[in-house]
Amino acid sequence: MKLQCCFTIRCCIVLLGLGAGSASRSLVAAEPAAPGAIRVAIYADAGASKKGSPRVQQCLPAEQGFQIAKITAEEIRAGKLRDFDVLIHPGGSGSKQAHTLGLEGRKHVRQFVRNGGGFIGICAGAYLGSASYEWSLNLLDARVVDSEHWARGKGEVQLRLPPAGRTALGIDQDFVAIHYEQGPLLAPGENRDIADYELLAAFETEIAENGAPAGVMKGTAAIARGAFGKGRVVCFSPHPEKTSACESFLRDAVRWAAPAKPD
């Protein structure tokens, strides 16, 4: 199944001589991270939206302690994740990202998180991080509800935040509006080998287009986080980077997922 969840990414580091069609070339930054900076790799290969988006970069500015670089599936298979603290898988197609990584690449991502790295999945990346498909990474103990109607539409939805979500996301209100683009509707996966996730936000309103049944989306998990081995995982079904009032959610998620820096 091809799961589309479009949003685009752009890296703050541009490498000379990199052509639009050279996704297999090295994209990893050669410069060392600033002291204390969280080193963030953004997946930039087949399955990620082609246009690229400044929004993820804008949410993670250097002056707030983030260092961003793109990474390809080939580099992941070559072990380049060792140079990073957190991996972000963005929107696009979760299944295509998985198949581009291949079995070996998916093993590297799982090992990276198991050993203490952080994983952030946004929309398609949340499909990838779930435990719902044969190609899923099985990092978050979550299954996708009503996957048949994944193309249920796009638009603004309301999220309901429980106390844990308000604390984790640094917001003092029960409800927040956020942009949604056909992300997964998540529910507990009941996988005994993966820790139960913590609900940070649930869908309070829904979009039910293109034949999707009404009454399914409300109450399912929109933002969830959990542990995998020594690492941490956060999955966003909607798009905090496309919602000005929610951009801080992504920063907080990356900080939480990143391994602690030594003193």
Where are these regions (language model features)?
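Bacterial N-terminal signal peptides
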Residues: 10-22
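N-terminal secretory signal peptides that target proteins for export/translocation
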Residues: 1-6
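Catalytic beta-strand/loop cores that center a nucleophilic Ser/Cys/Thr
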Residues: 157-232, 237-244
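Boundary at the C-terminal end of the N-terminal hydrophobic targeting segment
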Residues: 28-30
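Short, solvent-exposed loop/turn elements at domain surfaces
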Residues: 48-52, 96-97, 147, 208-209, ...
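Helical hinge/lid and interdomain linker segments adjacent to catalytic or ligand-binding clefts
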Residues: 39-41, 45, 49-134
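Class I SAM-dependent methyltransferase SAM-binding "motif I" and its flanking Rossmann-like core
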Residues: 130-173
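Extracellular ligand-binding/catalytic regions of CAZymes and related secreted enzymes
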Residues: 33-38, 110, 136-138, 143-146, ...
